Amino acid sequence: MAKPPVRKPKKKVCAFCKDKTQYVDYKDTNMLRKFISDRGKIRARRVTGNCTQHQRDVATAVKNSREMALLPYTSTAR
């Protein structure tokens, strides 16, 4: 018996490229929380759908935001 064809997952579109955003702001914590897991880790590019450059910008912004104490380094749940 032949296996049914496997569907390819839909390619995610970079949210920053779609909105034509030039700068990822480290002070915008509501936006940055979308790119952080519930454990406080930065989500992977294949999960978020960001392009390479914007994923780097998000990682830098999250790290700056953590340094400025706007975002936690880890989650509070234990």
UniProtKB/Swiss-Prot annotation:
Signal peptide extent: none
HAMAP family: Ribosomal_bS18
Subunit structure: Part of the 30S ribosomal subunit. Forms a tight heterodimer with protein bS6.
Pfam families xref list: Ribosomal_S18
Protein's UniProt name: Small ribosomal subunit protein bS18B
GO cellular component: cytosolic small ribosomal subunit
Gene Ontology biological process terms in this record: translation
Alphabetical keyword list: Ribonucleoprotein, Ribosomal protein, RNA-binding, rRNA-binding
Species: Streptomyces griseus subsp. griseus (strain JCM 4626 / CBS 651.72 / NBRC 13350 / KCC S-0626 / ISP 5235)
Role: Binds as a heterodimer with protein bS6 to the central domain of the 16S rRNA, where it helps stabilize the platform of the 30S subunit.
GO molecular function, one term: small ribosomal subunit rRNA binding
UniProt record similarity statement: Belongs to the bacterial ribosomal protein bS18 family.
